[in-house]
Amino acid sequence: MGRGRVELKRIENKINRQVTFAKRRNGLLKKAYELSVLCDAEVALIVFSNRGKLYEFCSTSCMNKTLERYQRCSYGSLETSQPSKETESSYQEYLKLKAKVDVLQRSHRNLLGEDLGELSTKELEQLEHQLDKSLRQIRSIKTQHMLDQLADLQKKEEMLFESNRALKTKLEESCASFRPNWDVRQPGDGFFEPLPLPCNNNLQIGYNEATQDQMNATTSAQNVHGFAQGWML
């Protein structure tokens, strides 16, 4: 009569648990050794007890080489499959960006008044509202720029006015400093010039009353003009 089926569950008795662990561990190590010898397989076995004690078996001379081989086989496949996931993610991102670019290009054409036949009434109203808002913003910015330019011109005008007034004041001060030198004159500076004496260059041989009267009139006129010219100087 065969053995009945043993239920697998934690052994509550501590002593029985330790005895069972020792038996099963030895059997597992034996099976690993037999597998490596019979099948020429590279086998590595690592067992930790409930107290943290290490039990190991390796069919090769170094456990680390077997572990490195295991890491290359396990994580290398993950690294190989990872680029495909990154490629898929990049492609999805490309599709999203392409859709955004298409929407922006269509919106740009609509703002230019193109491809409006495909839009509904509601979309046309939204487009009209957007254009009105853009125009108001453009006018506001344009007005602000003009006000800024006007303020700059007013500042330049004030600066020029102040500079002109300073130059005018300096010129008046310079003229005031030179005026006394022109107003004050000494008696012996030659301000009054002597009147020229009348002179008759005609040589008279004989006496003629008409000629004498004409000469007297000319001399009188010369005296008057000479006095006026000297007084004007």
Curated annotation (Swiss-Prot):
What start-end ranges are recorded for coiled-coil regions in this protein? none
In the record, biological process GO terms are: positive regulation of transcription by RNA polymerase II
In terms of SUPFAM superfamilies, this protein maps to: SRF-like (SSF55455)
Entries under Pfam families matching the protein: K-box, SRF-TF
Q: Identify the GO cellular component terms for this protein.
A: nucleus
Q: Where in the cell is it found?
A: Nucleus
Q: Which UniProt keywords apply?
A: DNA-binding, Nucleus, Transcription, Transcription regulation
Q: Domain K-box spans what residues?
A: 87-177
Listed Gene3D superfamilies: Transcription factor, MADS-box (3.40.1810.10)
Query: Where does the record place the MADS-box domain?
Result: 3-58
MF terms from GO for this chain are: DNA-binding transcription factor activity; protein dimerization activity; RNA polymerase II transcription regulatory region sequence-specific DNA binding
**Presence of the UniProt keyword Cell cycle in the record:** no
Q: Which InterPro entries match?
A: MADS-box/MEF2_TF (IPR050142), MEF2-like_N (IPR033896), TF_Kbox (IPR002487), TF_MADSbox (IPR002100), TF_MADSbox_sf (IPR036879)
Query: Is Membrane tagged as a keyword?
Result: no
Recorded protein name is MADS-box protein CMB1
Origin organism is: Dianthus caryophyllus (Carnation)
